[in-house]
């Protein structure tokens, strides 16, 4: 997860009653959607859900095509549902996603390996990208690496701030779906099919 939150909170998380509620938010070519979960004992339940259409041509294939129209839509959406903090799922089109192995690699050397892999797999200079990675839970040593152009993340961060949102994190849409739908105990290959209004995305996890 590409997080904009201060890393101290990862080490010393504040008490739950001090944490402002945050929603999950995603943007497609034609609409903005959010969902808010609530804990019920050991389970999570859907507390709220909302959706709003955005003007044609304002957003397409992961990019803002009409910035002012998109900002207006985001602002109206935030006010309509009284939203503020949000975890934002990023469309896959602007990302580079690949896997590599790190079995037997000391943890202190992981970053250097990641930078080598990014140089080999991403047609952008290292100083122009932001990346995140996930280690497999098993002993395979497999790493999943997600890379975005830094300019793309800055554009998203700017437009959401200007629209009144406080982005807490950015995450690839495919990763967000996998975390929501696939059990951590699942050790087989799973195909996730995300059917939208004008496109269908497939991902294998």
Task: Identify what each model region corresponds to.
Residues 44, 60-62, 95-99:
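Switch/connector loops and helix/strand junctions flanking conserved nucleotide-binding motifs
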Residues 29, 47, 65-72, 105, ...:
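Generic alpha-helix structural propensity
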Residues 48-78:
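N-terminal phosphate-binding loop and adjacent alpha-helix
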Residues 85-184:
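Active-site neighborhood for divalent-cation/phosphate handling
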Residues 2-53, 86-89, 182-205:
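Gly/Thr-rich phosphate-binding beta-strand-loop-beta motif of the actin/hexokinase/Hsp70
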Residues 32, 54-59, 93-95:
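Short active-site-proximal "capping" loops at secondary-structure junctions
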Residues 81:
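Active-site charged/polar residues at nucleotide-handling catalytic sites that mediate phosphoryl
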């Amino acid at each position: 997860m590409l997080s904009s939150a201060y890393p101290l909170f990862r080490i010393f998380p504040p008490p739950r009653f001090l944490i402002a509620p945050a929603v999950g938010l995603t943007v497609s070519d034609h609409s903005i959607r959010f969902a808010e979960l609530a804990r019920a004992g050991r389970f999570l339940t859907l507390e709220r859900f909302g959706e709003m259409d955005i003007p044609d041509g304002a957003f397409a294939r992961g990019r803002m095509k009409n910035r002012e129209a998109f900002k207006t839509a985001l602002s109206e959406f935030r006010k309509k549902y009284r939203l503020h903090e949000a975890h934002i799922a990023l469309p896959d089109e602007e990302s580079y996603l690949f896997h590599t192995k790190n079995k037997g690699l000391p943890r202190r050397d992981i970053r250097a390996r990641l930078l080598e892999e990014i140089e080999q797999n991403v047609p952008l200079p290292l100083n122009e990208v932001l990346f995140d990675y996930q280690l497999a839970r098993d002993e395979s040593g497999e790493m999943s690496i997600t890379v975005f152009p830094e300019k793309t993340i800055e554009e998203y961060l700017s437009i959401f701030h200007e629209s009144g949102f406080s982005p807490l994190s950015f995450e690839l849409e495919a990763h967000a779906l996998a975390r929501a739908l696939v059990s951590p105990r699942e050790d087989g290959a799973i195909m996730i099919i995300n059917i939208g209004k004008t496109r269908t995305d497939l991902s294998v996890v």
